[in-house]
Amino acid sequence: MKKFFLLMLFISMCGYNDSVEVINNETPTTTTTIGKNMNDKVYSNQPEMSIDLGKTYSALIKTNFGEMKIEFFTEDAPLTVNNFVSLARDGYYDNVIFHRVISGFMIQGGDPSGTGHGDYGKYPGYEFEDELNNQKPYEKGIMAMANRGPNTN
């Protein structure tokens, strides 16, 4: 787990049975429920760029422990933000659980298999290059993404 940015949540809160609402700076665009994924979606290609790089995007994750609002670093990681937003809009995260919860430290989610292994590369079916150069510190409350090594987002 060399690089972190989105999907794996490093947040001091923990939750289960959640929903994600992807929001740009004007209006909500989608709501996703997180639990056990029943749709088993796999994609053949990385999504086309569909976000507006001039807008600010965020996600609202609703859990039975409360809500978490996540702001994305669109300028720093446009491919990663586009990936998360596109997958959320398509329902990819519907019923996906937080498979790892460490109280007071972090939660991890986004793996449809519910194991954290991603069925060893099956999900979502494509990879893309790393974007961050670690300019942003990983402080308390930062959301991040794990991968299997360089350029395996």
Please provide the spans of the model-predicted regions.
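Sec-dependent N-terminal signal peptides
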Residues: F4-S12
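Cyclophilin-like peptidyl-prolyl cis-trans isomerases
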Residues: C14-N153
